[in-house]
Curated annotation (Swiss-Prot):
The keyword Lyase belongs to this UniProt entry's keyword annotation: yes
Protein name, per record: Putative hydro-lyase SAV_6940
Stated family: Belongs to the D-glutamate cyclase family.
InterPro entries: D-Glu_cyclase, Putative_hydro-lyase, UPF0317
Length: 274
């Protein structure tokens, strides 16, 4: 199933969303507010979510270990737990804007909470998200075209296969941000210092090098308009586990909706390396 109308970014709905605390953001999501979280709670770490039955958890942990660029693990829960030390008092079943529910690799629902779908055997993985370093890029003068245009970031399935792990396999997914040439060095420098949220780009320039035919037709998110001289810059993306779910077809999974992330209490500085 696919929704026809994309959700509006929260930064466009509320001009003060960048100043929300993570706790306030999570409370709003719990009340039913939803939309892409780029620019929300600026300076805090955002995370992708994937929850799988316990008998698939080792495969996912190994998949992440073997593919650290798209799948940098921030936390793994005990089976059945919906809490994380990354966000005091948070509930992983209710505190993301929108979720995706999968059965045998097929998308069956996109609810704003998953209490009704939760199972006692689910192990949840929180995986670093590149929205985290967008604040650092912006502070360095790098324009965020998708935020300027009130759109979700563009994400693409690539021709690069991830290293398989047990039953899990699939392609790497990337996010793309158009960057002016004069800001390319800053974009690479600032993102490289945050490896826990994907780090440096995996590719710059010609999208065909990743097997992407048309930047105007992303597989997830929204198309983003580039300025004439902008260079497309691609970062590994935490939607990669969803691509693995589609390819590997586990019996059940819950993920975040692309671009609609879990807001942690952790500051991005906590993951910055020298």
């Amino acid at each position: 199933m696919n929704r026809v109308t994309p959700d509006r970014p929260l930064s466009r709905i509320d001009g003060h969303a960048h100043a929300w605390t993570p706790r306030k953001a999570r409370a709003r999501f719990r009340w039913g507010v939803f939309g892409p979280t780029a620019g929300v709670a600026a300076g805090h770490t955002q995370a992708n979510l994937i929850s799988l039955p316990a008998d698939w958890a080792y495969d996912m942990l190994l998949f992440c270990q073997r593919n650290p660029k798209p799948c940098p693990v921030l936390d793994v829960t005990d089976a059945g737990s919906w809490t994380t030390p990354l966000a005091e008092g948070a509930d992983l079943r209710t505190d993301l804007p929108r979720y995706r529910v999968w059965e045998n690799g097929e998308l069956v629902a996109e609810p704003t909470d998953v209490v009704a779908y939760w199972r006692d055997d689910l192990v949840s993985f929180l995986i670093g998200c590149s929205f985290t370093f967008e604040w650092a890029l912006s502070e360095a003068g790098v324009p965020m075209r998708h935020i300027e245009q009130g759109r979700n970031v563009s994400m693409y399935v690539t021709s690069r296969a991830c290293r398989p792990a047990g039953r899990l396999h699939g392609p790497m997914v990337v996010s793309m941000r158009p960057v002016p040439p004069e800001h390319l060095a800053a974009a690479i420098r600032e993102s490289t210092m945050l490896p826990a949220v994907h780090g440096s780009p995996v590719h710059c320039g010609d999208p065909s090098g990743l097997g992407i035919d048309d930047l105007g037709r992303p597989d997830f998110g929204d198309p983003v308009d580039a300025e004439p001289d902008d260079i497309p810059v691609f970062w590994a993306c935490g939607v990669t586990p969803q691509a693995a779910v589609m390819a590997s077809r586990p019996p059940f999974a819950i993920t975040h909706a692309p671009g609609q992330m879990f807001l942690t209490d952790a500051r991005d500085e906590q993951y910055r390396v020298a």
